[in-house]
Amino acid sequence: MASQFELSVVSAEKEIFNGNVVSVRVSGIDGELGVYAGHTPLLTSIKPGMVKYTLENGKEEFIYVSGGFLEVQPTIVTVLADVAIRGEELDQQRILAAKRKAEDTLSKSNNAELSAKLSREIAKLRVYEIVNSKLANRR
């Protein structure tokens, strides 16, 4: 039995996940972070991307986050994000439409806020693609 710890993923609107996991992987500001039971305490910013966690049965699950914070304590890891969406709830058509709109607007002006929005949509699309390739492999 692998060592477990509690993972809590919370958005500004609601708790997205709370349960025991054996590992979690997050896109930190300075690179990818992998956390296992007994990890050194840590507080860091995370960038838009994927939270990937592994349950005790080996099943991997994915959540898109728009950025936020990761707090690692001895028995609990907390991800706080403005926006967090379970991978299976992502809508490819909406993501692609938002991405196209951001690209079109960005091509007409150089705006840091629009560039950040485009980065978030691309990160969201990556999570969607990973989740769907995993689902296709299960069939």
From Swiss-Prot:
State the NCBIfam families in the record: ATP_synt_epsi (TIGR01216), PRK00571.1-4 (NF001847)
Q: Which domain of life is it from?
A: Bacteria
Protein topology in the membrane: Peripheral membrane protein
Function as written in the Swiss-Prot or TrEMBL entry: Produces ATP from ADP in the presence of a proton gradient across the membrane.
- Where, subcellularly, is it found? Cell inner membrane
The record's PANTHER family line, in alphabetical order, gives:
ATP SYNTHASE DELTA/EPSILON CHAIN, ATP SYNTHASE EPSILON CHAIN, CHLOROPLASTIC
Per the UniProt record, which residue ranges are transmembrane? Answer: none
- Keyword Transport part of the UniProt annotation: yes
Family designation: Belongs to the ATPase epsilon chain family.
- Pfam families, per this entry? ATP-synt_DE_N (PF02823)
Entry keywords, A to Z: ATP synthesis, Cell inner membrane, Cell membrane, CF(1), Hydrogen ion transport, Ion transport, Membrane, Transport
Please give an example of a GO cellular component term from this record: plasma membrane
Q: Which protein are we looking at?
A: ATP synthase epsilon chain
Assembly mode: F-type ATPases have 2 components, CF(1) - the catalytic core - and CF(0) - the membrane proton channel. CF(1) has five subunits: alpha(3), beta(3), gamma(1), delta(1), epsilon(1). CF(0) has three main subunits: a, b and c.
The reply to whether Membrane figures as a keyword in the UniProt entry is yes
Its principal location? Answer: membrane
Q: Which GO terms describe its molecular function?
A: ATP binding; proton-transporting ATP synthase activity, rotational mechanism
Q: Which CDD domains match?
A: F1-ATPase_delta
